[in-house]
């Protein structure tokens, strides 16, 4: 865990496989009472999520927060759009980078920090299939090197 980070509730491992992460930033999430209870219970899925900048606001879409079991009538729709809290300058910078370079905003992880739900957003560029194969090859080569080094060190 990085400095100042709280309890990690959910991670989007597929994001680092499908995208090249250029920059990350922390954003607050606007949630209802039953949603924050579900998040604290780790009942959240970031897999297909993405964020968009619309009218000077950042919105999180396609993130599934399961309905709280004891929430009855107060439960919200599981995949509704949720507002993210960022400073105005951060939003303007993101908007420029997204429009100019064809990048996207991907949720990387959700954690609880000082009692508040925070989202780590990644400014990302999509990988092509051959980029993914290169990443896999590089990872396997590093594993092989580590395996050989371990064998040498044990002798």
UniProtKB/Swiss-Prot annotation:
InterPro entries per record: SmpB (IPR023620), SsrA-bd_prot (IPR000037), SsrA-bd_prot_CS (IPR020081)
UniProt GO molecular function: RNA binding
Keywords per UniProt: Cytoplasm, RNA-binding
Family: Belongs to the SmpB family.
Record-level GO BP terms: trans-translation
GO CC term, one of those recorded: cytosol
Entry keyword annotation includes Lipid metabolism: no
Location(s), subcellular: Cytoplasm
Gene: smpB
Keyword Nucleus set for record: no
PANTHER family reported for this sequence: SSRA-BINDING PROTEIN (PTHR30308:SF2), TMRNA-BINDING COMPONENT OF TRANS-TRANSLATION TAGGING COMPLEX (PTHR30308)
Disulfide bridge positions per record: none
HAMAP family, sorted: SmpB
Main function: Required for rescue of stalled ribosomes mediated by trans-translation. Binds to transfer-messenger RNA (tmRNA), required for stable association of tmRNA with ribosomes. tmRNA and SmpB together mimic tRNA shape, replacing the anticodon stem-loop with SmpB. tmRNA is encoded by the ssrA gene; the 2 termini fold to resemble tRNA(Ala) and it encodes a 'tag peptide', a short internal open reading frame. During trans-translation Ala-aminoacylated tmRNA acts like a tRNA, entering the A-site of stalled ribosomes, displacing the stalled mRNA.
Designated name of the protein: SsrA-binding protein
Species this protein is from: Streptococcus pneumoniae serotype 4 (strain ATCC BAA-334 / TIGR4)
């Amino acid at each position: 865990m990085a400095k100042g980070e709280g309890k990690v509730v959910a991670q989007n491992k597929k994001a680092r496989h499908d995208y090249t992460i250029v920059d990350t930033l922390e954003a607050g999430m606007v949630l209802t009472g039953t949603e924050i209870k579900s998040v604290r219970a780790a009942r959240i899925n970031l897999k297909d999520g993405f964020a968009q900048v619309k009218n000077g606001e950042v919105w999180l879409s396609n993130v599934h927060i399961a309905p709280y079991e004891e929430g009855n009538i107060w439960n919200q729709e599981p995949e509704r759009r949720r507002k993210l809290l960022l400073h105005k300058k951060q939003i303007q910078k993101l908007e420029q980078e997204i429009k100019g370079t064809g990048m996207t905003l991907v949720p990387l992880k959700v954690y609880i920090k000082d009692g508040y739900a925070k989202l780590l957003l990644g400014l990302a560029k999509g990988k092509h299939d051959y980029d993914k194969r290169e990443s896999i090859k590089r990872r396997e080569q590093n594993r092989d090197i580590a395996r050989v080094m371990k064998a040498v060190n044990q002798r």
